[in-house]
């Protein structure tokens, strides 16, 4: 479904030499230097740039949410989608201040929203099934979700966008992400489950128990990423996977947000390991398990701000760092240019 090749590493010595010969001590710009190197390898150009950056927020409801594993009911998903479209959410603020276009994708929320210029409807249903009792979705729905996510990114690629961030909204999706993590890493649910929106100890234990029950129920269907998505995934998570893989296929830079988006990235990398070369992990969230996910992906996040909101907020906040990496790479003088001797 996707043809992904890792960036040509032949220019890496030239790129690193260019970075090392800027007017600074070796490595003095820390992680920004690694970002510049990654962007230069992805783009394979003498100057690197960010063109028409977009943040895509995929929204979907989850059958597992009927067990009250969140402080918020499922109705909040649709309410927050309306808030995104009205421009009133945190992600709207961060996209506005960082000059990043925002699109909202209805992957399958309970209540279909009204049409809006910034809304893309790719509905797969009125929410997934309760994966503690049934498969979250069918195998065919997973394939449709991947295609839907890929289509959104392909449109952006045709519009000369070369960087896309992925966010999400869906009451219950931390449960889905934790189940995905447990299945991929083959570890117990209690090592993956966090408090999500801020649940108490009793709800936390209920969440662990339900996810453990689900993993036992679907044990024979958790052998590959697509089956994991069908068993315990979410409509929005599956579409994000498709979008990430299409972005990598198109050699676009991918900004990975928090716990849920990183679960999607884990699935994408499990399907196509080469995709990870195009992924920049924006932050380490406060959600339990996220740090372990990042370690599994051999990822060093750019930020650690204690975020646990989702929506793509960490991705939007990281964008200025990427712009700064481009600026120093393109414009900072070399020792020779500046007449500085060391």
UniProtKB/Swiss-Prot annotation:
EC numbers: 2.4.2.21
Cysteines engaged in disulfide bonds, as pairs: none
Annotated keywords: Cobalamin biosynthesis, Glycosyltransferase, Transferase
Pathway info: Nucleoside biosynthesis; alpha-ribazole biosynthesis; alpha-ribazole from 5,6-dimethylbenzimidazole: step 1/2
Domain of life (superkingdom): Bacteria
Catalytic activity of the protein: 5,6-dimethylbenzimidazole + nicotinate beta-D-ribonucleotide = alpha-ribazole 5'-phosphate + nicotinate + H(+)
Residues the record marks as active site: 311 (proton acceptor)
Record GO terms (molecular function): nicotinate-nucleotide-dimethylbenzimidazole phosphoribosyltransferase activity
CDD domains cross-referenced by the UniProt entry: DMB-PRT_CobT
Key word S-adenosyl-L-methionine present: no
Keyword Transit peptide (UniProt): no
Annotated GO biological process: cobalamin biosynthetic process
Family of this protein: Belongs to the CobT family.
Function: Catalyzes the synthesis of alpha-ribazole-5'-phosphate from nicotinate mononucleotide (NAMN) and 5,6-dimethylbenzimidazole (DMB).
Protein name as catalogued: Nicotinate-nucleotide--dimethylbenzimidazole phosphoribosyltransferase
Organism whose genome encodes this protein: Photobacterium profundum (strain SS9)
